[in-house]
């Protein structure tokens, strides 16, 4: 299956932001497939191999919220990376799966303004590929200090369609949110 990354706009297009007083047809915060990600898909398809998405990284954008472009090959300023913790199927669209990381309370002391989904190289001696790149509403991730602590969950939608095989590698040491644990325990319904 081919994976395409897109922005999901809560509430549909009526909620699109105004930029400079003019309504836009794109959301302010979004994620897109990079050229390197598309090239990796094509090479994987030709080689009969899957694209393996395994890591999500976040960055502070070097103090600014970047505008994602498909020519990105790295984050502007990466501050944290983590193996993908979990994935879930979209409740409304079976062609969309969500990849998630949870940044735990023990990590922090940085701003999040950008993120990237990294794919493993096709060859053992290759370099990981920035598969998808997006921006993030500015969020300060606290580190557990003096009784204050936060976790932060980042979820990225991946749209599956039909030309390349995409695998999402979930860390064996994945992190479950409190809600997920309650759902597993049967205390909270879906």
Language model features by range: what are they?
Residues 176-190:
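A signal for long, low-complexity, Ser/Thr/Asn-enriched, surface-exposed stalk/shaft
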Residues 2-172, 189:
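N-terminal assembly/attachment segments of tailed bacteriophage virion structural proteins
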């Amino acid at each position: 299956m081919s994976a395409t990354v897109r922005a999901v706009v809560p509430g549909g297009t009526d909620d699109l932001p105004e930029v400079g007083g003019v309504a836009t047809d794109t959301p302010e915060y979004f994620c897109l497939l990079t050229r390197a990600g598309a090239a990796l898909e094509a090479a994987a398809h030709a080689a009969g191999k899957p694209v393996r998405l395994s890591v999500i990284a976040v960055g502070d954008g070097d103090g600014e919220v970047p505008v994602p472009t498909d020519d990105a090959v790295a984050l502007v300023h990466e501050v944290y990376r983590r193996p993908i913790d979990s994935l879930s199927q979209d409740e409304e669209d079976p062609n969309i799966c969500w990849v998630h990381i949870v940044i735990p309370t023990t990590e922090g002391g940085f701003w999040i303004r950008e993120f990237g989904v990294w794919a493993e190289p096709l060859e053992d001696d290759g370099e990981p590929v920035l598969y998808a790149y997006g921006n993030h509403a500015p969020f300060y991730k606290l580190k557990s200090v003096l009784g204050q602590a936060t976790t932060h969950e980042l979820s990225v939608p991946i749209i599956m369609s039909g030309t390349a095989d995409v695998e999402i590698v979930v860390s064996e040491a994945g992190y479950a949110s409190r809600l997920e644990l309650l759902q597993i325990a049967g205390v909270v319904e879906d």
